[in-house]
């Protein structure tokens, strides 16, 4: 698939949220009637080309929900949300991770996956890899296996892929 359709709908916004940062805005991609469908199709093709066959999709709050559900629908699979703390009503696993300034946490229900599940992690952006690594750690607490991670965008100069060494990582658009 030609990824120009996707790349052309990601807008570079200089100096947001602070000077020196170039924010990659996906809202035009989502606003396009074909944007989400084409992104899910491109993700599905990437998985097929690598021989990755998940049994379930996990998406990280919040934009991972958007792309994760679209991909799950395209593949005929279920979807599990990976949430910020305090959003899930039943017993959870929790993993904390470091941000540039401070820390954050993610949670999933303890029974979100079966030990036989082959989980694909979906999110919009791979930057430093902290959120993705925490997501992998959460899934591994359930005894399920992570078969890959896929992102719409990868910011290569932030080396997030290095943090995920040993995992199958894909990104549709790289900057």
Model-inferred region functions:
Residues 55, 117, 147:
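Conserved acidic residues
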Residues 2, 8, 134-175:
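PRPP-dependent phosphoribosyltransferase catalytic core
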């Amino acid at each position: 698939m030609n990824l120009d359709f996707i790349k052309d709908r990601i807008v570079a916004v200089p100096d947001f949220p602070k000077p020196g940062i170039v924010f990659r805005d996906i809202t035009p991609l989502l606003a396009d009637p074909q944007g989400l469908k084409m992104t899910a199709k491109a993700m599905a093709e990437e998985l097929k080309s690598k021989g990755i066959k998940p049994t379930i999709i996990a998406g990280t709050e919040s934009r991972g929900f958007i792309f994760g559900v679209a991909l799950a629908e395209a593949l005929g699979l279920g979807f599990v949300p990976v949430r910020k703390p305090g959003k899930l009503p039943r017993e959870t696993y929790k993993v904390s991770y470091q941000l540039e300034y401070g820390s954050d946490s993610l949670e999933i229900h303890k029974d979100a996956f079966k030990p036989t599940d082959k989980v694909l992690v979906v999110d919009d952006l791979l930057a430093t890899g902290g959120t993705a690594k925490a997501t992998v750690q959460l899934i591994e607490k359930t005894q399920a296996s992570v078969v890959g991670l896929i992102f719409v965008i990868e910011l290569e100069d932030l080396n997030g892929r290095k943090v995920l060494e040993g995992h199958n990582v894909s990104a549709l658009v790289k900057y």
